Amino acid sequence: MPSDNCLEGLISQIVADPALHARWLNTFSYLEYVGFRKILKSQRAEVLTAAILGHACEEGRHALGLKKLAVKLGGAGFDSYAPQVLLCGEEAEAYFQDLDQFCDEAFADRSADERVRLAYSYVTWLVERRALDVYGLYKSALGDSEIARKLGGLLAEETKHLSDIEALLQAADPAFSTRSKEFESVENSLYEVFLAALTKALAQESPVKVAVAS
């Protein structure tokens, strides 16, 4: 895929620079945190299932693990989500929030609980499909390293959860086979916007004023 080829080149540039690499990891951590936060904010306690609570805990654990890797690589200056220690953090969150808004609006005619459940399920399915692709390319660029090994565990969990959420969607939405293609197209367009922003940012990159651990 053209976008994969583009991302491979960007990842090569990122992992060659410890400061950029730490920001990259921190941005992944931030997105996992955004997912964790959104699950807790969107789900009413009365309908919060063990599966959804488990997913929230998984997102929080991934956010923490990636944060620790960012701090280990970049130093204490990366122990926050300040804009200067993220890599296109605003654009990455916009991808997530815009996708969430699209899915929510797509089910505006449903009951409140069904709308929340379907929007959550589709956003999760779309984001985890993308995450598996991006994390997979990233892991391939790392060789046999601590970060690659930790990503392997994360990928295994994401793969299992993607399978579970897809089975849930196929059972809950009779229109899944057609709706999923429409939603994939929207997600891909939003991802391309983020990828363009990342390409531009790396082309203009100058050293970040953060002490990087030696």
Whereabouts are the PLM-identified features?
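Non-heme di-metal
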Residues: 1-214
